[in-house]
Regions:
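Intrinsically disordered, low-complexity regions
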Residues: 2, 31-32, 36, 57, ...
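Negatively charged, low-complexity tracts enriched in Asp/Glu with abundant Ser/Thr
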Residues: 2-81
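Generic intrinsically disordered, low-complexity segments enriched for polar/acidic and small residues
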Residues: 7, 22, 60, 86, ...
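Glutamate identity and glutamate-enriched acidic tracts
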Residues: 21, 30-37, 43, 52, ...
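Acidic, aromatic-enriched beta-alpha/helix-loop junctions
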Residues: 62-115
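Acidic, low-complexity intrinsically disordered segments
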Residues: 111-161
């Protein structure tokens, strides 16, 4: 083999491999252990659903939180009216990481573009560790918001997105 006279480091690039920054954040592993909980908060007129997937280090890597309004909630008839004849008209808010982003679905809000609000884009590959921290932080924020300051959370929903 001839010597490399130019002293350059030639590397063959595999064009079939996408750049690292385009690697998507992984979807939840439905076969992995999932922590699920349902909390009936009758005094608030809500039912709160929690699903979380944790990594080996205890960080929440995926989550789904849903706050449902029951018929005991003062806003129930308004929710029913705004949602129409759909069977799931009592759903107020759901926050999850299903589609490579941390996002919120907000229903019944009288504002434009109220169905989805994107908070953070997530990435895999080199950026996955940073994305995991974003997911874990978002989980704590929404978890605490729904559990400890639920009335503030519902007021925000009634007013629309800030």
């Amino acid at each position: 083999m001839a010597l490399n006279i130019n002293k350059k480091n030639y590397r063959l690039a595999d064009m079939s491999i996408s750049p690292d920054e385009s690697v998507p954040y992984p979807d939840p592993d439905e076969t992995a252990e999932i922590i699920e909980d349902k909390i009936d908060m009758a005094e608030c007129g809500t039912i709160w659903h929690v699903r979380e997937w944790r990594g080996d280090d205890g960080l929440v890597e995926q989550f789904a939180l849903m706050l449902n309004v029951t018929s005991a909630h003062p806003a129930y008839s308004r929710c029913q009216q705004l949602k129409g004849n759909q069977h799931n008209f009592d759903q107020v808010r759901r926050t999850d990481t299903w589609h490579s982003s941390v996002h919120s679905h907000q229903y019944f809000i009288d504002c434009e573009d109220c169905d989805r609000e994107v908070h953070h884009e997530l990435a895999g590959g080199r950026e996955e560790e940073k994305s995991r921290r974003v997911v874990n932080g978002s989980f704590k924020k929404h978890y605490d918001g729904m559990l400890y300051t639920q009335f503030d959370y519902l007021e925000r929903w009634k007013r629309g997105k800030p």
